[in-house]
Amino acid sequence: MKIFNTLTRQKEEFVPLEEGKVKMYVCGPTVYNLIHIGNARPMIIFDTVRRYLEYKGYEVNYVSNFTDVDDKIIKKAIEEGVSAEEISQRYIEECKKDMAGMNVKPATTHPQATQEIDGMISMIQTLMDKGYAYAVADGTVYFRVKKFKEYGKLSHKNLDDLQSGFRALQVSGEDQKEDPLDFVLWKPKKEGEPYWTSPWCDGRPGWHIECSVMSKKYLGDEIDIHAGGEDLIFPHHENEIAQSECCNDKIFARYWMHNAFLNIDNRKMSKSLGNFRTVREISEQYDLQVLRFFMLNAHYRSPLNFSADLMESSKNALERITEAAGRLKDRKEKASAVELTEAEEKLLAEAEGYVKKFEEAMEDDFNTADALAAVFELVKFANTNVTEESSATFAEGILEILVKLCDVLGLAAVKKEEILDKEIEDLIAERQEARKAKNFARADEIRDELLAKGIILKDTREGVKWKRA
């Protein structure tokens, strides 16, 4: 299995630190709003990487954080007149709903930055003790970039070039820094902002230290794969390497994976352009399996363009898979013959060739586009060779292969059983009773159960409205 490593800019054979186990960290979203389709790309891509590793027999410890303290969260909290914690917890729950809709498996651990402050203070103190960090008069703590001789190795940036650029960009209030390149590990509190007590001042951590600490706590000093969007390569991941390797005296991550940007109608997605699309908005038009298919139908390192036409194409393509699976299921249930014929045995063996093609694509830096091409070859094979005369065992064998490959991609080949309207109404009524009784855990369970069955709830003044995804 080969992975393109951003660190070396080449494909490398994947060799885990410990045989049969993979330690993987993926930078998660900053939770101040509903996630947008740009956030969705790394979630879907690296969930698929995880699924393939598990398919190959690896035990994957998959950690993905929520950044729940940030300027954007604080700004939103001030605008709404609520606490930053209320904002972050609200959008963590909304993010989990969207992840369930996209069939993104929950991480082994979803740490939250605000729950790991003690670890951050401890790592900063270690860096100070080693001479890699220093505090200034107002209590701000900075990392000494030039003391880490390998700084720039991930982004392949030259320190001298960075120096001139950063000197021009130095903002007011940072004149106490020893060097313009030095970045913040801890910052003093501001009026109305959340803060924690530290040896240097009451304040909060810098963004970069959060992931270094959460990765160390839940995965150890060294990990196999660190992943995220390509916008995180510099400065975030570069700074993570500096902090972690200077603190732990070990190589932080063996393989660095980054997905490319997503544009909308060939333009960068932004609120100012009015083309900002949330996953929730997409779910009102399409089953989120369609969004997942769309994301996987391109190589993760290639820029991806989102458009209505491409989503329609993805919807139609996904239907070809589900319709083929439906026909196979129907044939399995209705076939009069049960035993495989000699010809069918040969055809089943031939079908395994598509599994090999699928695996070859995935083992070449997780080429999901080519893996999907192998799935469609299997669909064509099934449509041609499974007929009304086919045995139940043959139809079942082909269906099992199709379902297996789709499951690795997080796609449901066989449509979920339709949930009846009465069942939905009964569950909504139970949820309302749970909320009245302040049993919010049960209410959330019911909501998630319905979401998993493709039912979206919307709480309104007139009561709870629901619709099928």
Which residue ranges define each predicted feature?
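Structural preference for alpha-helix termini/caps and helix-kink/transition segments
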Residues: K268-M269, N275-A469
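N-terminal, positively charged nucleic-acid-binding surface of large information/translation enzymes
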Residues: T8-E13, L17-K105, E462-W466
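Alpha-helix C-terminal capping/helix-coil junction sites
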Residues: E54, A100, M128-D129, M257, ...
